[in-house]
């Protein structure tokens, strides 16, 4: 039986410091606030939103959810985003992705205010991530992956890390952050040939492909550390990851569960980024 890497101890440790930070800000008359912009009501978005709202409430961060219909026009969405950008009471903005087809993310990503873009949608923050510039905001989920590995004292330096998925939301940023920790990184995707033979080389496997229980036992190396980023919700509301947890837990050395794994840490990173944005906007360093 592998060592199950629960997210709660990691999230709680991060949150402890954030609670104290919020208290200091409130003494200065500043209340950090997060705005969530959600189009439609996808199950994985709602699950993440619920966790984010709960985490922010515990820490003392105000929140506002702006829900839009699935068929909202790009013009209307951009107008709402610009209003949110210009609201001085809002310090962080989270836009759930992927957006519906009528909303062009390649246009919208240039509209979000970089200083409020706490999940790395803006090309400015993406460039800072690539440069290793800590003044930006890396995506929350890949940062949660790194925090889990550090918390459980998993050595990254010199290890082979395989990232399954190449999105700008998780896959590519996770690879860059692992590279920053001096891991040797391979990115796999839908066109990778002999996929399982590549993933089996990883001392660390990060699954971020967005397919319910896609990663089976034959995908992983004996004793590997498996980090499951997936959130997949079925018709009955049951949540599963991208990894077949039951099938892989005996072979893996360490493995994160879904739920109660990466997601809970992601919300703490989100809160951390809201506070960072708030401090920067108020010139508190």
Swiss-Prot record:
Gene3D superfamilies: Leucine Dehydrogenase, chain A, domain 1, NAD(P)-binding Rossmann-like Domain. NADP(+) binds at residues 165-167, 190, 231. Coiled coil: none annotated. Pathway: One-carbon metabolism; tetrahydrofolate interconversion. It catalyses: (6R)-5,10-methylene-5,6,7,8-tetrahydrofolate + NADP(+) = (6R)-5,10-methenyltetrahydrofolate + NADPH; (6R)-5,10-methenyltetrahydrofolate + H2O = (6R)-10-formyltetrahydrofolate + H(+). GO terms for biological process: L-histidine biosynthetic process; methionine biosynthetic process; purine nucleotide biosynthetic process; tetrahydrofolate interconversion. One of its GO terms (cellular component) is cytosol. InterPro entries: Aminoacid_DH-like_N_sf, NAD(P)-bd_dom_sf, THF_DH/CycHdrlase, THF_DH/CycHdrlase_cat_dom, THF_DH/CycHdrlase_NAD-bd_dom. Its EC number is 1.5.1.5, 3.5.4.9. The keyword Oxidoreductase applies. Keywords: Amino-acid biosynthesis, Histidine biosynthesis, Hydrolase, Methionine biosynthesis, Multifunctional enzyme, NADP, One-carbon metabolism, Oxidoreductase, Purine biosynthesis. Pfam families: THF_DHG_CYH (PF00763), THF_DHG_CYH_C (PF02882). The keyword NADP applies. GO terms for molecular function: methenyltetrahydrofolate cyclohydrolase activity; methylenetetrahydrofolate dehydrogenase (NADP+) activity. Belongs to the tetrahydrofolate dehydrogenase/cyclohydrolase family. Homodimer. Catalyzes the oxidation of 5,10-methylenetetrahydrofolate to 5,10-methenyltetrahydrofolate and then the hydrolysis of 5,10-methenyltetrahydrofolate to 10-formyltetrahydrofolate. This is Bifunctional protein FolD. It comes from Alkaliphilus oremlandii (strain OhILAs).
